[in-house]
Amino acid sequence: MYRISQLMSTPVASSSRLEREYAGELSPTCIFPSFTCDSLDGYHSFECGSIDPLTGSHYTCRRSPRLLTNGYYIWTEDSFLCDKDGNITLNPSQTSVMYKENLVRIFRKKKRICHSFSSLFNLSTSKSWLHGSIFGDINSSPSEDNWLKGTRRLDTDHCNGNADDLDCSSLTDDWESGKMNAESVITSSSSHIISQPPGGNSHSLSLQSQLTASERFQENSSDHSETRLLQEVFFQAILLAVCLIISACARWFMGEILASVFTCSLMITVAYVKSLFLSLASYFKTTACARFVKI
């Protein structure tokens, strides 16, 4: 803001109607109501008028281009002095500077993010947990990168809202340094895993061989279960066919009573033999599997 002492002298063009009665000295007053001192000819765009509410007298005010846009100073007859060259010198004791205060918001409200109640049940943020394993991938997923970008955007907006209190560049530098440190740790861990001694490689090979053996055993057990089911079905079909053939032959050669008795006894013996045969088959299969596992 400029002080009044900086605005003491304002040169203007000399007027043809100005009577040069003063030689070498400043006149104590310049008759402002008369047009003998035509000092405001070049500044009509800055002229304004004001009326004293107490006395009702008319005051001439002039908006200064050197002041702020909301400031102006009021002239009276005793506010300035004129010399022979037409220069005007303001009298600070008789000049009042007025300002109109403009209401300007200095502090801005912080932007608050309002989350709705339905967003709490949104599963889009947990897709990486639902569709992937926790320890499956060491590197960050795209959803995690988007989340980091969103948090950085919120931090920058908060910094722009409070530019006088916070340093946004330091925050962004911290984010970048943290990300670079994480990437360096990941690369160092991967290089450590790659550069293992030969003993570690042999241990990993033994583990792989054990895993392949267990997988083969599971495949063989599934194959054995399928073959066992087929054998049981085939054996039952053969027994049924044999019983039907024997019953038909007995009825043809013998009477009805003898055929029924023979058929019942045959069914009992077949059921006993079937259970005995199945128990023996299961015993031999379990022993064979145990020997295969030991090998």
Curated annotation (Swiss-Prot):
Top-rank taxon, per record: Eukaryota
Membrane-crossing residue ranges in chain numbering: 229-249, 253-273
Keyword Cell wall biogenesis/degradation: no
Keyword Manganese: no
InterPro entries membership: TMEM71
Subcellular location: Membrane
Sequence similarity: Belongs to the TMEM71 family.
Protein's name according to its UniProt entry: Transmembrane protein 71
Gene: TMEM71
